[in-house]
């Protein structure tokens, strides 16, 4: 049976270090563990799922551009680019693909510079502070929104 939707997960800088980087803030779950769980969940939901992690802003932007026309929803943890990247915001707006912004930690309970996001006001929603579970909730929400809009 053909997959209903294509959902793209993008992870920004330093998320390749999950599990070992500041586990008190980000948890002990690795990015590979998160992606594996989402792949299993997506398969059960009959959804095509793809993933990219990059420490390079231009790679994330190029991937967003390439998603135009073949991706129904983007899940993105922009990491530090949340607070700095107008270019990432512009790329997401340019392709008109709905997206959910995800953060493992509660950015509002951290340093003041982390309180501002260049993406939040144009996102479908923002999930923060729920650890790795936030990714699962984002995938479930994306599928539900796509299912009810088609």
Curated annotation (Swiss-Prot):
Sequence positions that bind substrate: 77, 83, 90, 104-105, 114
Top enzyme category: lyase
GO biological process, one term: chorismate biosynthetic process
Pathway: Metabolic intermediate biosynthesis; chorismate biosynthesis; chorismate from D-erythrose 4-phosphate and phosphoenolpyruvate: step 3/7
Matching HAMAP family: AroQ (MF_00169)
EC number in record: 4.2.1.10
Top-level taxon: Bacteria
Keyword Lyase recorded: yes
InterPro entries: DHquinase_II (IPR001874), DHquinase_II_CS (IPR018509), DHquinase_II_sf (IPR036441)
Organism: Pectobacterium carotovorum subsp. carotovorum (strain PC1)
Pfam families linked to this entry: DHquinase_II (PF01220)
Name of the protein in its database record: 3-dehydroquinate dehydratase
Keyword annotations from UniProtKB, A to Z: Amino-acid biosynthesis, Aromatic amino acid biosynthesis, Lyase
Site note Transition state stabilizer, residues: 21
GO molecular function: 3-dehydroquinate dehydratase activity
Family under the similarity heading: Belongs to the type-II 3-dehydroquinase family.
Described purpose of this protein according to its UniProt entry: Catalyzes a trans-dehydration via an enolate intermediate.
Catalysed reactions, as listed in the record: 3-dehydroquinate = 3-dehydroshikimate + H2O
Active site: 26 (proton acceptor), 103 (proton donor)
SUBUNIT field: Homododecamer.
